[in-house]
Amino acid sequence: MAREYARTDRVGQQIQKEIATILMREIKDPRLSMTTVSAVEVTRDLAYAKIFVTFFNDNQDEIKASLEVLAEAEGYIRSLLGKRLRARIMPHLRFVYDSSMSEGVRMSALVDQAVASDKNGDAEVDDTQVDDEPSVDSEKGE
C-alpha cells in the first residue's frame, strides 16, 4: 500500500519536471512567459493530474487568460509529455492557479505591518497604562 503512494509521488515529480521544461521550451505563447509549475497532484490510478501553476503577474484577468491558454494546450502538452515519459497511462491534465505564493506574500506583508504598528504603538500603550493605573486602583476601592 505504501509503495502505491510513493509511485504517485514519483510520477508527480516527473510530470512537474517535464511540464516545466515543456512550458519553457516548447510553448511559444507570450501569455505563458514566466510560468512556474509549483506542484503536481496525481490520482492513485494515475488517470488525472492536477498541475498547480504560478505566473509572474498577479493580475486576475491575465491569470484567467493564461489558464485558458493552458487548458486549450492541454492535449498538446499531454502528447509531448507522453513522448517524454515511459508510462502505460498518461494522465489527463488540469491546470490550476496556485495562490499560495501570493497569499504568502500578502501574509508576510500583514505580519510586517503588525510588527511596525506594534513598535509605534508600544510607546503609546506605555503612556496610557501609566495614566490608567490610578483610576483602576480607585475602582477597586469602591
Swiss-Prot record:
Keyword annotations of the record: Cytoplasm, Ribosome biogenesis
Originating species: Colwellia psychrerythraea (strain 34H / ATCC BAA-681) (Vibrio psychroerythus)
Subunit relationships: Monomer. Binds 30S ribosomal subunits, but not 50S ribosomal subunits or 70S ribosomes.
Pfam entry (one): RBFA
PANTHER family: RIBOSOME-BINDING FACTOR A, CHLOROPLASTIC-RELATED (PTHR33515:SF1)
One Gene Ontology cellular component: cytosol
Location in the cell: Cytoplasm
Gene Ontology MF annotations: ribosomal small subunit binding
Name of the protein in question: Ribosome-binding factor A
Gene: rbfA
Xref: InterPro entries: KH_dom-like_a/b, RbfA, RbfA_dom_sf
Biological classification of the source: Bacteria, Pseudomonadati, Pseudomonadota, Gammaproteobacteria, Alteromonadales
